[in-house]
Regions:
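Residues on the lipid-exposed face of transmembrane beta-strands in outer-membrane beta-barrel proteins
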Residues: 73-77, 93-99, 111-115, 155-159, ...
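Short glycine/proline- and aromatic-enriched beta-strand/turn motifs that initiate or cap beta-hairpins
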Residues: 38-103
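Outer-membrane beta-barrel transmembrane domain signature
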Residues: 41-44, 49, 53, 174-175, ...
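Cleavable N-terminal export/targeting peptides
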Residues: 1-64
Length: 291
């Protein structure tokens, strides 16, 4: 989640070479840590929650800093897989890097470029990562095999009808699920001060049959190994939900974020034999330092 924080001329980083080196070392480490700490899908939070306030920020802070970098630690309470009734705690890192209003790297948005930019909109492309699914994550997945991690490409757009931000994104996996997924969401600030902000908003997700079969389907071989009945889902809306994101700067640089999300599985995703809970909850806490 991106935040603007208290005003300060020191927010503009004057040592881009140092920042580039730091970013490079961080990304090297990033490739070595568990996949679920990376920019990912299926994401436990709505995508807008990773970038809440970015588009609105340009209305109140002009010019934007050349570099905006924050890094910290995070922990998340989330289902073991989409549709699970079991929960676990997943640690990770919180990394957000932005260059003006041009390029970015964040945990939920991935590595991207804003190709079109205006006072009330932005649109671009990004490269993310589908972490896949490991059958050892839950006894409810035994016999289904693993879904391999794979990169995915994304096209996104945001538009502001102040104070509401509308967002849509379409992504395509390459390996793993090889499917198309689209998200549409909206969010707005409901509370705020110089050091404290709260955003809330709904999200709906549509997935094609390839994605649905990979994550919610049961083919004949999987049916034999797992004991589940065969199930061939089609395309359609897979979920709808609501999220909230809050940030508190207790100093000029240190801040805490709290994110919560409720997701309701729909259609064939809800009817899948591996779906044990239609309602999915996620809580995420992080502490980070903004340079």
């Amino acid at each position: 989640m991106d935040v603007s924080g208290p005003s300060s001329p020191r927010r503009t980083i004057r040592r881009p070479a140092l920042i580039s080196l730091m970013l490079g070392l961080t990304l090297c480490l990033f490739c070595l840590i568990p996949g679920k700490a990376q920019a990912q899908t299926p994401s436990p939070l709505s995508e807008w929650q990773y970038s809440a306030g970015v588009l609105l920020r340009s209305k109140f802070e002009n010019p934007l800093p050349t570099w905006d970098v924050s890094v910290g630690a995070a922990t998340s309470l989330q289902p073991r897989y989409v549709g699970s009734s079991e929960y676990h705690v997943q640690p990770g890192i919180n990394l957000d890097v932005r260059y003006k209003d041009i390029a970015f790297f964040s945990m939920g948005e991935g590595l991207g470029v804003n190709l079109l930019r205006g006072e009330n909109f932005r649109a671009g492309v990004a490269l993310g990562f589908d972490v896949g699914r490991d059958q050892d994550d839950s006894s409810q997945l035994r016999g289904l095999g693993d879904i391999s991690p794979a990169p995915e490409a994304k096209v996104f757009a945001e538009y502001t009808i102040f104070p509401v931000v509308l967002r849509t994104a379409v992504r395509r996996g390459f390996g793993g699920n090889n499917g198309w997924v689209g998200d549409i969401s909206a969010y707005l600030p409901v509370a705020g001060s110089e050091r404290f902000f709260v955003f809330v908003g709904p999200t709906a997700t549509y997935a094609d049959s390839s994605y649905m079969r990979r994550y919610f389907g049961i083919n004949p071989n999987q049916s034999i190994r797992s004991g589940y009945r065969q199930f061939t889902p089609g395309s359609g809306f897979s979920s709808a939900g609501f999220g909230s994101s809050a940030v508190w700067f207790w100093t000029e640089h240190w801040f805490m974020t709290a994110d919560g999300a409720y997701q309701r599985l729909l259609g064939d995703a809800a009817d899948s034999p591996i779906t044990r809970a239609h309602s999915q909850l996620t809580l995420n806490l992080s502490v980070a330092y903004r340079f």
